[in-house]
């Protein structure tokens, strides 16, 4: 299996990310890129996925998006990307991170496997329950 290379996205990646990131506006995408809040995964120089994050309550790093192309899933890249993100934040002095997943998404099992604990949830607009996960760096 080819090795995943992870790098911090920059504003130079705007055109690339615009082709894939459809959950946020172009303006927010530019802000995320300029604030170094997107990690880009590549294999042999080919884009395969990304992780986007923000801050919950302006304090706790919160992973908003982890996505890999369909044909790149199941190769351990998601685990490697999340571990890279966690280690980056630990080195910056953070003691915990958060994320979420709808109760009907497979991602909830992925996060539990990585040591995340469900700490609550909420429902919006009749969507399935959104489960909030936390991982502490003890």
Segments from the language model and where they lie:
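Conserved acetyl-CoA pyrophosphate-binding loop and the N-cap/start of the following alpha-helix
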Residues: 72, 76-84
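Active-site beta-strand termini and strand-to-loop segments that position acidic
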Residues: 42-44, 134-137
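Conserved GNAT acetyl-CoA-binding A-motif
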Residues: 89-102
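Acetyl-CoA-dependent GNAT
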Residues: 2-64, 69
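A short, internal acetyl-CoA/4′-phosphopantetheine-binding micro-motif in the GNAT/acyltransferase core
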Residues: 66-73, 102
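Short acidic/glycine-enriched loop/turn segments that link adjacent beta-strands
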Residues: 35, 59, 104-105, 125-129
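Conserved catalytic-core motifs of GNAT/GCN5-like acyltransferases
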Residues: 98-100, 112, 117-132
């Amino acid at each position: 299996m080819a090795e995943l290379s992870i790098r911090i996205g920059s504003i130079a990646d705007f055109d690339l990310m615009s082709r894939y990131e459809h959950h946020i506006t172009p303006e927010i995408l530019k802000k995320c890129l300029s604030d170094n809040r997107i990690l880009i995964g590549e294999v042999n120089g080919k884009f395969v996925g990304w992780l986007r994050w923000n801050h919950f309550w302006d304090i706790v790093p919160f992973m908003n998006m982890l996505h890999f192309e369909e044909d790149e899933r199941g190769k351990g890249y998601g685990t490697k990307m999340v571990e890279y993100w966690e280690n980056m934040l630990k080195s910056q002095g953070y003691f915990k991170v958060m994320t979420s997943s709808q109760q009907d998404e497979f991602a909830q099992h992925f996060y539990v496997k990585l040591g995340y604990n469900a700490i609550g949830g909420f429902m919006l607009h009749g969507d399935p329950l959104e489960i909030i996960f936390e991982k502490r760096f003890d």
